[in-house]
Structure formats: C-alpha cells, structure tokens
C-alpha cells in the first residue's frame, strides 16, 4: 500500500503499541519465509522462543495449509472468500476494497499480484487509518466505515476458521490474539 511513503520512520515512532501489534500481524501474514514468519510470531508473542525452535516446521506446515496451499485453503486470507456469493479471488469484494482505497488516496503497490483484500493489506490499512484517526476526523470516519462496514463482516469468520483448522498452538494463539486486537480496534472506532 502506498500513500507517498505514509509509514516513514518518523510515523513508526509515533505508532501506539496497538498499531505496532497490528503491523506485526500484517508482517506475519505477509512473510515470505519461515524465518520472517517466526520473527513476526516472536514480536506478537515474546514467549514464543519455543515455537521458533521446536515448532517452526510445524507452524510453517500449518501456515501453508491454512493460508497458502497448494491444497484447498483451510482459512483463506481474503475477504472476498467470505463476503462474495461465489467465493472467488479478485471478485466484487476485492474491487470494492480497491475502490475504497482509491477514495482515500491509497493503492496496493502490487496490484493484481496479491488481491487488495488480502488480510495483510487490510491489517496495514486498519493501522494506517488508526494512526491518522487520532489527528483527523476524516480518517476516523474512514476507519469507522472500514471496520464496521467491511472487517467486521468477514474477519470473525476468518479467525474462526483459523481456530477450527489450526494444528499448532502457535496458530491458535495467533487467532486468539487477532480476536483481541480486533475487539480493541472496534472499541477504538466506537469511542
């Protein structure tokens, strides 16, 4: 996602611990390899050293089964799978997210490579809107629309699928923490 380098080093310093945790979730779902994924898990769960050493391979298998494939995904990380009548990638929901991004001057830098409604992009958007909402009613309104009109409609079902299908304690803990994070996000929107 890009808004002329909206997350420069100075804004990272201004992020709350809540927002930093949101970016750690983004990084976990966007990680390209086991090492990066384990690093994200360690940020989310400092006590996860054991997972890094003992369960790293199992977590990787679990991650792939849940979110990547090659078999049918157990917990697809795309909003369109949960919201569209036909659970397809790059469907109406993806285009709706793209339009929402454009309406606030943002876009996904790898458009058509990874669908705009991938959980990692949506986590980043929620964090960006949250960070800016502290200073701008315009961003608070956008955050409210995004959370209540979009995330709330699919993220709980996604988390339930993770809980129901995960094989490792790391993934089950991730689902629990994502639930807590999302509950706090909704509280911030309502206030």
Positions of predicted regions on the chain:
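Surface/interface-facing alpha-helical segments and adjacent flexible terminal/loop regions used
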Residues: 1-191
């Amino acid at each position: 996602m890009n808004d002329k380098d909206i997350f420069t080093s100075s804004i990272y310093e201004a992020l709350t611990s809540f927002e930093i945790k949101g970016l750690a979730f983004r990084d976990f779902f966007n990680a390209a390899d086991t090492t990066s994924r384990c690093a994200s898990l360690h940020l989310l769960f400092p006590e996860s050293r054991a997972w890094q050493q003992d369960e790293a391979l199992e977590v990787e298998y679990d991650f792939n089964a849940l979110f990547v494939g090659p078999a049918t995904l157990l917990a697809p990380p795309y909003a369109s799978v949960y919201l569209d009548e036909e659970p397809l990638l790059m469907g109406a929901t993806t285009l709706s997210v793209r339009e929402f991004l454009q309406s606030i001057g943002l876009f996904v830098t790898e458009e058509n490579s990874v669908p705009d409604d991938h959980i990692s992009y949506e986590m980043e958007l929620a964090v960006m809107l949250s960070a800016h909402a502290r200073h701008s009613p315009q961003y608070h309104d956008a955050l409210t629309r995004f959370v209540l009109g979009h995330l709330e409609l699919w993220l709980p079902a996604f988390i339930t699928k993770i809980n129901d299908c995960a094989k490792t304690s790391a993934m089950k803990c991730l689902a629990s923490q994502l639930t807590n994070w999302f509950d706090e996000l909704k509280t911030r929107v309502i206030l």
